[in-house]
Amino acid sequence: MIVGTGAAGLFAALNLPRDRKVLIITKKDAESSDSFLAQGGICVLKDESDYESYFEDTMRAGHYENRKESVDIMIRSSREIIRELIGYGVKFERKDSGREQDAPEAQKKTEKQQSEGHENFLDDYAFTREGAHSKPRILFHEDVTGKEITSKLLAQVRSLENVCIMEYTTMTDIIVAGTDGQTGEDGMQCAGIIAEDAQGNVLKIHAPYTILASGGIGGLYEHSTNYPHLTGDALRIAEKHGIRLEHLDYVQIHPTTLYSRKPGRRFLISESVRGEGAILLDKNGKRFTDELQPRDVVTAAIREQMKKDGTDHVWLSMERIDKDTILNHFPNIYEHCLEEGYDVTKEWIPVVPAQHYFMGGIWVDSDSQTSMEHLFAAGETSCNGVHGANRLASNSLLESLVFAKRAAQKIEAELDAGGEAEQLDETA
């Protein structure tokens, strides 16, 4: 049982045994996950010489409150994850002529390089840089990297005969079962979920293992870049059952969303824009901060400047970025701003901080196992400690994929060992 059709939920499904039936539910349509909204890119360890720098950048951004083991696992796993994404048809920008690498060519080249002893299959790819990164290490697809990755994963999952996706189905509780009292929270383990479909029918779905990958908490905020239906349902249910939670106060505010008086989800202006040279300006057109500091630092600087200026926003100028880069790297941002009346190639745009990401969540170990047996969590729903108190830009997709795969691998290992949930004395 998987709850959520974002990157974590889909990648978990792809890594579970094909001889097991897998049911995925999602609160809205399958495409309405925050993973689809991710703009900037996905980090990767370019080569071994970048390890220390990447590790330090992640730790520093997280105020050194990160779980070091988790950071190491994520970084060490990144190259394998990227290889798998390319194999699934994900296209990342290449150096030559801004052309993206298609899957067959990438796979063929990767195999050839490996057979010849070359370890770095990433040499032909273009990398961008974002705030708090000491060097470029972010792969990207225009300014819709999340959509590119997640749509390809969703297509792969939909092709699997052993997986069924139920849309417009909301988890309302988990099923817990008593054991011999030796494992889990007070001898209880997860045995499935309770859900409600679009017609209001209550569904009791039994499963030996459950993965919670239902996203973050942005729907609880008035101003957020998240979809409004992401309201932390899994956290509420976990708390009800005494499942361990961690760092619920670790909420990231993104420095730059397009200012608007309209209600609803805020449109993100990717950090990659600042990585490529955009600068922040006060009401007088004066630059007031280093745009490539960690997100919480830049957010604080913007809020302080807004207070000084007595304004509801500051300005972002892309004048230092050439027009071709804007049109090729940031076409979605360019088009959206045009729709809102701003031509970013000719004028500044108003930006304001908004809630963006949840670093806390349901506590999990390095295999994404929660404190309740047979219950796993991955993606923004979970807290494995990678991000510490503040997430480094473009680590979210990578973290979701790495630890979703580890959850699937752990479940497969337990199934191979004969582990099935005992459905005794069920409660909900």
Report each predicted region and the residues it spans.
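N-terminal Rossmann-like FAD-binding beta1-loop-alpha1 element of flavoenzymes
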Residues: 1-24
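Glycine-rich loop(s) and the adjacent beta-strand/alpha-helix scaffold that form part
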Residues: 209-263, 267, 395-406
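Glycine-rich active-site loop/strand segments that organize a redox cofactor
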Residues: 43-74
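Core beta-strand elements of the Rossmann-like FAD/NAD(P) dinucleotide-binding domain
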Residues: 199-209, 370-374
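An anion/pyrophosphate-binding glycine-rich loop and adjacent beta-alpha core
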Residues: 30, 237, 243-349, 410, ...
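Conserved redox-cofactor binding core of oxidoreductases
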Residues: 86-201, 213, 257-260, 280
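Active-site-proximal substrate-binding core of FAD-dependent oxidoreductases
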Residues: 244-259, 383-395, 405-428
